[in-house]
């Protein structure tokens, strides 16, 4: 059985290459991965830094003799200031954020959701260890970013120890 968060996060990646503004790591099947995921593969993760933007690229190669199935659901983490009210989420295009976009079970994620929102200010009363959910009717954007005073950072989960770790999880199925 595969762990709910997958096997790659618990695996040791090899360094493939280092460039002026990129680094690539590679993971291939091994005895441990094959016990959870019965396919031969090559997963390359490349991080590219351009100006103030960090991009992550995933490349999966089927090295097996049969069709493989996979999903990338990354949980990148970055250290940030704990002054959460200084942050906002910006969508590429205006989105229809539902009233039931949640901060916690019954608490709205935004102060006053509007029909079309491009930027959402993060509430100052974030509870460490809680995940913030923003539900959209039909997502129009191909990207979402978190801004801090004009500098893009990325990703939204606030760690329970309130150390300023921030995680954003997007999974495409």
Q: Where do the protein language model's features map onto the residues?
A:
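Residues that act as N-cap/strand-start positions at coil-to-secondary-structure junctions
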Residues: 7-10, 39-41, 72, 83, ...
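Acidic (Asp/Glu-rich), glycine- and aromatic
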Residues: 41, 57-88
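Active-site/ligand-binding surface loops and adjacent short beta/alpha elements
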Residues: 77-161
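Structural motif
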Residues: 22, 53-55, 67, 143, ...
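A C-terminal functional module that forms or caps the active site or interfaces directly
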Residues: 157-173
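Extended, loop-rich substrate-binding clefts of extracytoplasmic carbohydrate-active enzymes
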Residues: 2-51
